[in-house]
């Protein structure tokens, strides 16, 4: 959407001729040269027939949604025309919130999988030191330490500081690479960097890529709600998500959100 070079409408600036170099991304003003990096988003527009973009896109209440705010035009994925709090009215704030939502969505999807998958394997005979997600970390303080996947030959962790430092270094390196645009500045959009982050080439087709952005946000929003539910379950029941699901299916009348909410006593 944004251009990669600057055009000057007048041949002079402050009375001095302006010479343009052969490189369209650099200019000379007097004796000084400056170079401009490609801006943050090179936009690939979805087809006008997409149900997820444009003025005729799917809205939050379908045909009963009413008129969307003027600043919600259907330009971005996940825009259902709903913003009663006006959080998207300021373009700069909206841009920051979009990035926060996408990043948190990705972490939530990974987190939800990490909460459910070990418990699922444990219930099917795979041995874990502790399969319940909010109890697993405490194993590092046990005498034997924490074995990843219950296998001491993989990662045998006995220092919480070492685990913390390793996560900061590895996660920080990847995030730094994404935000900085890669070592050569080849990443145009830090939200959807592509390149090494897309080894399968899922973003090669613009229309498919536009639809994948919507799917990512829809699943990410569900995952964020799921993680919130997992936290509440852990506090109220002291059990993992699959065990809570099994309890509900075995006795839905006594094992549900309402019964726990009306009988919950903090600290018990």
Curated annotation (Swiss-Prot):
Binding site for chlorophyll b 5: 167, 264
Region (Disordered): 1-31
GO molecular function: chlorophyll binding; metal ion binding
Record-given protein name: Chlorophyll a-b binding protein 8, chloroplastic
Binding site for chlorophyll a 4: 219
InterPro entries: Chloro_AB-bd_pln, Chloroa_b-bind
Biased composition (Polar residues): 1-13
One GO cellular component term noted in the UniProt record for this chain: photosystem I
Gene designation per UniProt: CAB8
Keywords: Acetylation, Chlorophyll, Chloroplast, Chromophore, Magnesium, Membrane, Metal-binding, Phosphoprotein, Photosynthesis, Photosystem I, Photosystem II, Plastid, Thylakoid, Transit peptide, Transmembrane, Transmembrane helix
Residues the record lists as N2-acetylarginine modifications: 37
Residues reported to bind chlorophyll a 1: 82, 88, 101, 221
Domain-related comment: The N-terminus of the protein extends into the stroma where it is involved with adhesion of granal membranes and post-translational modifications; both are believed to mediate the distribution of excitation energy between photosystems I and II.
Cofactor binding annotation: Binds at least 14 chlorophylls (8 Chl-a and 6 Chl-b) and carotenoids such as lutein and neoxanthin.
UniProt subcellular location: Plastid, Chloroplast thylakoid membrane
């Amino acid at each position: 959407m944004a251009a990669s070079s600057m055009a000057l409408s007048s041949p002079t600036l402050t009375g001095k001729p302006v010479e343009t170099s052969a490189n369209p991304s650099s200019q000379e003003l007097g004796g000084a040269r400056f170079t401009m990096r490609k801006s943050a988003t090179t936009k690939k527009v979805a087809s006008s027939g997409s149900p997820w973009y444009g003025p005729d896109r799917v809205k939050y209440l379908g045909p009963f949604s009413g008129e969307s705010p003027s600043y919600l035009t259907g330009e971005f994925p996940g825009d259902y025309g709903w913003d009663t709090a006006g959080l998207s009215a300021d373009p700069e704030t909206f841009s920051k919130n979009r990035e926060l939502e996408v990043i948190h969505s990705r972490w939530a999807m990974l987190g939800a999988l990490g909460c459910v998958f070990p418990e699922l394997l444990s219930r099917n005979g795979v041995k874990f030191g502790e399969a319940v997600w909010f109890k697993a970390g405490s194993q590092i303080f046990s005498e034997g330490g924490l074995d990843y996947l219950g296998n001491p030959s993989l990662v045998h962790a006995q220092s919480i500081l070492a685990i913390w430092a390793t996560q900061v270094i590895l996660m920080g390196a990847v995030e730094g690479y994404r935000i900085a645009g890669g070592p050569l500045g080849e990443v145009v959009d830090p939200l959807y960097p592509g390149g090494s982050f897309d080894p399968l080439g899922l973003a090669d087709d613009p229309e498919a890529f536009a639809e994948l952005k919507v799917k990512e946000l829809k699943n990410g929003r569900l995952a964020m709600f799921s993680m919130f539910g997992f936290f509440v379950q852990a506090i109220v029941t002291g059990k993992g998500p699959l065990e809570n699901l099994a309890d509900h299916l075995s006795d839905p009348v006594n094992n549900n959100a309402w019964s726990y909410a009306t009988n919950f006593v903090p600290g018990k």
